[in-house]
Amino acid sequence: MSSIKWKSKDAASCIIIPSELDHKYSRGTLGVITGSAQYPGAAVLTTSAATATGLGALRFHSSSGLAHLVLHQSPEVLVQPGPVTAWLAGSGINSKRFSDITTWLRHRWFVLLDRQSVPTLLDAGALHLAGSLEQPTLITPHSGELSKLLAQRGVIASAELIESNPSEWAMKASELLAVTVLLKGSKTVVAQDQYLIELPVATPWLATAGSGDVLAGIIGALMATNYIEILNDSKRLADVAATGAFIHNRAALIASNGAPISASSIISAIPKAIGKILA
């Protein structure tokens, strides 16, 4: 199985630089359904990471007072429904559909994913939708989540087995579910049909709470700005996912400089990471 080793020049090709003719809506709008009463920080981290990555606008679909938290951190976020060019759904949402009223309210928004059929990222509590949407779809599980997702389709593979050969299992999941798969781990891989991308080994400091939410926000923003390219090129979604992971690791390295980091510090380093990639 051949693969592509993702490099800075590859990532640069997926970062859309605005022209003097662009305005906020021409640059792409990301619709975000993340966070819950149990994990309110996911709403803040995903939206903050997306806005730091650069896009025209972001629409946050709220419940349970999450809008207040998001707007306090990112007042530029829109909190009313409207047209979007990509979706990010599931981060910080319980996978058990109706475990509490907040989870029910978050899942209620998922019906919009079908109504606006644009490139969609499914994470955490939205992974169960993998394979059910017609639009280009990316899932971003870690090995444990992928193990559960495969088991629901009758394929038994432990998290440990998946971690022993992430490339093989990401490819199998992509074929089984007919989606693009970004399998998170120290060795992150992206698979789409027979197309496989391997990312550089990530800094171990990325093993911190909320870093996956930051990754989802970065990729979501890139999907929103690349939506035309994704719809016109079957491999573009995989390239965009790999670019998001590449930016994520670069930002973590900048934030860390050999020391511990938090998810929030990764977000602060995103613009500098993108600048270095484009330099």
Predicted regions and their residues:
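Non-cysteine beta-strand/loop elements that form the S-adenosyl-L-methionine
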Residues: P136-G144
